[in-house]
Regions:
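N-terminal beta1-alpha1-beta2 module of alpha/beta enzyme domains
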Residues: 1-66
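Flexible, glycine-rich active-site loops centered on histidine and acidic residues
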Residues: 2-17, 79-142, 180, 188
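Conserved, mostly hydrophobic/aromatic
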Residues: 3, 31, 35, 43, ...
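Hydrophobic faces of well-ordered beta-strands that scaffold small-molecule active sites
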Residues: 3-7, 39-41, 71-73, 101-105, ...
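Active-site mouth loops of central-metabolism enzymes
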Residues: 7-22, 76-83, 154-164, 273-282
Length: 331
């Protein structure tokens, strides 16, 4: 089973967005050397915690600084943009870096509604237009008769992916004949049948003749379970602050996270968000990921790892690669 990376360019307390981007670039090179298959970057707006607001620009830098790992958006939030312009961007990247570009698109705003309206040229949100936008984007990328034709035209088109965390996105991906990435790290309480909905509604397309799905999971891997749980506290507390808008949402130290006293509701939120995370030793994480892939019926696994310390983040991926024997080409 192939293993991939989603990186959100997290900003630690005491750090900066510039530092976060440099760490994302370094992590792409590091995970490529370890044998990971894809490296995707996310889109978020108006947040102190995550630096990536323009994945298409970061993708160009990542592709330039790596050699063969697939580079993608995880994802571009299509309702904010013109599908035609997104197609031009994706084709440009595919011309520069042939056979390496994944274009993951999603419906979620990636921000609050105030910022979502600011992203729109007329101050109106268009999330209800997403299915139509996806259909148009497919035609622009893959239909040679589409007019006006999208230029430049690469020798090999980018791979369009649907991203989502709900049955609606799974069904739409199936109907459009697209590969589907389910964000379990965003919606950990979703029924394991989510990918069945995708498979049942799948209509083969020239790009994707049979269903293909990946599952994105929060992962923290360390030499001991205790250390992995300690490292995971940073993400858990910072995400709680991010979700509630209370406190500094930048990635805090494990020591600060451990000192936070949670209410019963806050603890329940943290526990629920961590229910499908893979946190532990390499063997524990490997077993949890295989178990999740089997339960959901996923073809591929994508991992997202956030720690306060960048070296701990790299170490987590190194241990994971070793557990999956990525360097042997067998996983």
């Amino acid at each position: 089973m192939q293993l991939s990376v989603l990186d959100q360019s997290p900003i630690r307390q005491g750090g900066s967005a510039a530092q976060a981007f440099q760490e994302t670039l370094e992590l792409a090179q590091f995970t490529e050397a370890l044998g990971f298959h894809r490296f995707w970057v996310s889109e978020h707006h108006s947040t102190d915690a995550l630096a990536g607001s323009a994945p298409e620009i970061l993708m160009a830098a990542l592709a330039q600084h790596t050699r063969h790992i697939r580079i993608g958006s995880g994802g571009i939030m299509l309702p904010h943009y013109s599908p035609y312009k997104v197609a031009e961007i994706a084709n440009t990247l595919a011309c520069l870096y042939p056979e390496r570009i994944d274009l993951g698109v999603g419906r979620a705003p990636g921000t609050d509604m105030v910022s979502a309206r600011a992203l729109s040229i007329d101050g109106k949100t268009r999330f209800d237009k997403f299915p139509e936008q996806v259909e148009n984007l497919q035609s622009m990328l893959y239909d040679a008769d589409f007019r006006p034709a999208v230029k430049p035209q690469p020798s090999a088109s980018p791979n369009l992916w649907m991203l989502g965390s709900s049955p609606d996105s799974a069904v739409l991906a199936g109907q459009r004949g697209l590969p589907y990435n389910f964000a379990l790290f965003i919606n950990p309480h979703m029924d394991t049948r989510i990918l069945e909905y995708y498979q049942q509604r799948f209509e083969p397309s020239a790009q994707c003749p049979k269903p293909y799905s990946s599952l994105t999971v929060n992962v923290i891997c360390a030499e001991t379970e205790q250390e992995a749980k300690r490292l995971a506290l940073s993400r858990q507390i910072s995400f709680l602050r991010f979700a509630t808008g209370k406190g500094d949402s930048r990635i805090c130290t494990p020591e600060e996270a451990a000192s936070v006293v949670l209410s019963a509701d806050e603890q329940a939120f943290v526990d629920q968000r961590s229910s499908h995370a893979a946190i532990g030793t390499p063997e524990q994480v490997r077993d949890k990921l295989f178990s999740l892939a089997e339960a959901f019926g996923a073809d591929e696994l994508m991992t997202v790892t956030i720690t306060h310390d960048f070296e701990a983040r790299k170490r987590s991926y190194a241990l994971l690669a070793d557990a999956f024997k990525l360097s042997d080409g067998v996983n």
